[in-house]
Swiss-Prot record:
Molecular function GO terms recorded: rRNA binding; structural constituent of ribosome; tRNA binding
Gene, per the UniProt record: rplA
NCBIfam families cross-referenced by the UniProt entry: rplA_bact (TIGR01169)
Keywords annotated in UniProt: Repressor, Ribonucleoprotein, Ribosomal protein, RNA-binding, rRNA-binding, Translation regulation, tRNA-binding
Alphabetized SUPFAM superfamilies for the sequence: Ribosomal protein L1
Record text on subunit structure and interactions: Part of the 50S ribosomal subunit.
UniProt similarity note: Belongs to the universal ribosomal protein uL1 family.
GO biological process, one term: regulation of translation
GO cellular component, one term: large ribosomal subunit
Domain of life: Bacteria
Function recorded in the entry: Binds directly to 23S rRNA. The L1 stalk is quite mobile in the ribosome, and is involved in E site tRNA release.
Protein name, per record: Large ribosomal subunit protein uL1
Short name of any one Pfam family annotated for the protein: Ribosomal_L1
InterPro entries: Ribosom_uL1_bac-type, Ribosomal_uL1, Ribosomal_uL1-like, Ribosomal_uL1/biogenesis, Ribosomal_uL1_3-a/b-sand, Ribosomal_uL1_CS
Origin organism lineage: Bacteria, Bacillati, Cyanobacteriota, Cyanophyceae, Synechococcales
Length: 235
């Protein structure tokens, strides 16, 4: 732990208490990702919303143009011919009532759960298990669908679901330290555009409050979100 602490302090010393230009910020986070594994790069967006009100909640998906840099395990709850379709599309776990029972019993070795509409009455009883983990299928995020092949392909290619937590903060993983700075910036722009495009109808006053990015083991870096928005608007 001592070496990690020293490394973190050294990395933290390179970060100034200011909002960095977007490309400068991702480059600095990359430079400070010095762990012996490929660190995940995350964005933390503080928004001016209060999610306890339904018209100030944010839950949506973002398609990262440069991918996520990681493989995800997808489970699909369906029946009939859709079982073979889901397996052919690459889902790791596929089943009907038996899979529902397995999940209820604690089988959670998947990162994303997709369900066909006809199975949602069965899936509904898993709310207590899936809800706290953010895994409950939802039509708004494309995880309740009859087109399981397309859904699986999209999520495998880099589509991510995210939501604002109780404090109004959005946490999104948008790449790996091994990505180029330009690719990380492209993904970060997609996150920003998605957050703006899905602004809750009840949001009042200043929507964006702050944006920080960080790597798994590195210090956080503040990003000038206005400059990020300007980059997107210029395209």
């Amino acid at each position: 732990m001592k070496s990690i602490s020293k490394r973190f302090k050294a990395a933290q010393a390179t970060v100034e208490p200011r909002a960095y230009a977007p490309l400068e910020a991702v480059s600095l986070v990359k430079a400070n990702a010095t762990a012996k594994f490929d660190e995940t790069i995350e964005a933390h967006v503080r928004l001016g919303i209060d999610p306890k009100y339904t018209d100030q909640q944010l839950r949506t998906t973002v398609a990262l143009p440069k991918g996520t840099g990681r493989s995800i395990r997808i489970a699909v709850i369906t029946r009939g011919e859709k079982v073979a379709e889901a397996k052919a599309a690459g889902a790791e776990l596929v089943g009907d009532e038996e899979l529902v029972d397995s999940i209820a019993g604690g089988q959670m070795d998947f990162d994303l759960l997709i369900a066909t509409p006809d199975m949602m009455p069965k899936v509904a009883k898993l709310g207590r298990v899936l809800g706290p983990r953010g895994l409950m299928p939802n039509p708004k995020t494309g995880t309740v669908t009859t087109d399981v092949t397309n859904a699986i392909n999209e999520f495998k290619a880099g589509k991510l679901e995210f939501r604002a937590d109780r404090s109004g903060i959005v946490h999104v993983q948008f790449g790996k330290a091994s990505f180029s700075a330009d690719d990380l910036l492209e993904n970060l722009k997609s996150v920003q555009e998605t957050v703006d495009r899905n602004k809750p109808s009840g949001a009042k006053g200043r929507y964006w409050k702050s944006l920080y990015i960080t790597s798994t083991m590195g210090p956080s870096v503040e990003v000038d979100f206005s400059a990020l928005q300007d980059l997107s608007n210029a395209e």
